[in-house]
Amino acid sequence: MARTTPISRYRNIGIVAHVDAGKTTTTERVLFYTGKSHKMGEVHDGAATTDWMVQEQERGITITSAAITAFWKGSEKQYPHEHRFNVIDTPGHVDFTIEVERSLRVLDGAVVVFCGTSGVEPQSETVWRQANKYGVPRLVYVNKMDRAGANFLRVIGQIKQRLGHTPVPIQLAIGSEDNFQGQIDLINMQAVYWNDSDKGMVPVRKEIPADMLELAEEWRNNMVEAAAEASEELMNKYLEGEELSIAEIKAALRQRTIAGEIVLAVCGSSFKNKGVPLVLDAVIDFLPAPTDIPAIKGSNPDNEEEEMERHASDDEPFAALAFKIATDPFVGTLTFVRVYSGVLNSGDGVINSVKGKKERVGRMVQMHANAREEIKEVRAGDIAALIGMKDVTTGETLCNADKPIILVRMDFPEPVISVAVEPKTKDDQEKMGIALGKLAQEDPSFRVKTDEETGQTIISGMGELHLDILVDRMRREFNVEANIGKPQVSYRERITKNCEIEGKFVRQSGGRGQFGHCWIRFAPADEGQEGLQFLNEVVGGVVPKEYIPAIQKGIEEQMKNGVVAGYPLIGLKATVFDGSYHDVDSNEMAFKVAASMATKQLAQKGGGELLEPIMAVEVVTPEDYMGDVMGDLNRRRGMIQGMEDTVSGKVIRAEVPLGEMFGYATDVRSMSQGRASYSMEFKKYDTAPSHIVESVTKKQG
């Protein structure tokens, strides 16, 4: 089938916000306006849609849709052709930063929603940081302009001051709170109002109110100046006092937004139906198509050193990234993918290049606001759900088997908290295994393992809330009742000294013996290296090349078991530089054991130390309770990093060891009569004090 929407008219966007900015309402309005203006069941890039089946409505199934496809021709039908939006859903809670990260990884642009009253809140900063990390161009939408205390320009000031970005308003608010009526469109210098009769579908353009003209001219000048900075040519034109045309202003603002130099800002009230169609227009005008951003990078599965890339084109080999796995009771596992290049037809074979496993694509579906559409093919720039994938985890690449590539992996943080789970009945035992397996496949920051000594099932995640929700999902979705143990901290270990250690494993008693012998130089790894940095400096073949990987494996396996108290060893540099071998008795196993024996000696010779996870904690509290909250954080070995005033109270930032934060949610509520709230995320590992080391080593026996 031929492509019906050219890739230049695609917009893969996310609507991103923290908990209370009004993201859900905004997303609903986006679907309402796009669904209204585009008759479902007309021609798509695929087949006609089938409405939800009756049993689905009766059974009340809702598939957690990771992405919804919608179409838009403009609030005043000003674009000659429809643009295709893929709106990717992102959660707002900070315990799910991993969810936000994986959405941002496959987005080309984002609309960041702020509340007109509370403005930039601590959690907005987390989301903003993540968008910076993935270089996502964004627009700012200041919502809830009808709320008491709403002030568009104050929020613009906060974005500049707290987020360190240059916001450029392309609108101003007309009125605020109960009197919020609409926007001033600074590009066209018109006032825009909305009718209740069509639920704010079509903007009504009028002249700018006389009392706002001066302010509008001032902000338009700021905007034009920001546009002129896009090129020397425009700057000269601007400085010489020539008018920039509307087309020039738009093109320049688009260029600077995509380059990440500025963020354009608009305002409105999603709930009162005032402004969302203009947000959609701004997405088309200023956010990138897949072809506007650099080609995606990857590596050759056979040689990880070799860099490769894929351009957003149907003519390149097929490559897609699985960014979310969801379980549906009727069709099984849905694997949501973002296609970066090439074409895939249902029934095609692909390879999961990370695992080296072949997969066959059964059916493919796309989600719309009110229908699920089965499609026969996906092309570069598309987002769809594949049915029938056997063994694909979030973050893995699916690609053409003849031209494999591993797309840049997402970094998933290591879990910082663990609890033991036990099924309540024998019946639950088997179901729990299946449920945990499915949940771990969906969420790479959630791990499941069996403790070899106690036989208990241990689950690990990013915070208490993260694990609570997963246990709750196990009960709701899989009918598994389980008891939860006390939370345990996931410590780490590292060495502090450089040392040279000999590892020798010799068994020569009758028949074929074992002989492995190596000298390894150990040191703390270079800055920023978390795992093992392994170097081979053996010369003259004293240890044959084929045994070097076995030495690396021996070190890695021992690192998992630690050298101080049985916790994983991180940040280790190991250089094998000497050794010897036996013509007959040497083999890979012997060298692996020798390297493992050498690594074990690090406890004595490498100055091994225990590290504890430190969390970045932000507490928002009314001023009356600030003293209590700070005193309590100090008692928990917290280091106060800073404080500031916000509309919602005092924000206290601190770094606190995770081990001291268990049960904090309840404590902070009772300290503040339920008025304080907090968020926390993993920051770093740091040396644990001696009393913690003692109690941990005692526990490990």
From Swiss-Prot:
Coiled coil: none annotated. GTP binds at residues 17-24, 89-93, 143-146. PROSITE patterns: G_TR_1 (PS00301), G_TR_2 (PS51722). One of its GO terms (molecular function) is guanosine tetraphosphate binding. Residues 8-291 form the tr-type G domain. One of its GO terms (biological process) is ribosome disassembly. The keyword Protease does not apply. It comes from the Bacteria. It is found in: Cytoplasm. Its main location: cytoplasm. Pfam families: EFG_C, EFG_III, EFG_IV, GTP_EFTU, GTP_EFTU_D2. GO terms for cellular component: cytoplasm. Keywords: Cytoplasm, Elongation factor, GTP-binding, Nucleotide-binding, Protein biosynthesis. Catalyzes the GTP-dependent ribosomal translocation step during translation elongation. During this step, the ribosome changes from the pre-translocational (PRE) to the post-translocational (POST) state as the newly formed A-site-bound peptidyl-tRNA and P-site-bound deacylated tRNA move to the P and E sites, respectively. Catalyzes the coordinated movement of the two tRNA molecules, the mRNA and conformational changes in the ribosome. Belongs to the TRAFAC class translation factor GTPase superfamily. Classic translation factor GTPase family. EF-G/EF-2 subfamily. This is Elongation factor G. It comes from Pseudomonas fluorescens (strain Pf0-1). The lineage of its organism: Bacteria, Pseudomonadati, Pseudomonadota, Gammaproteobacteria, Pseudomonadales. The gene is fusA.
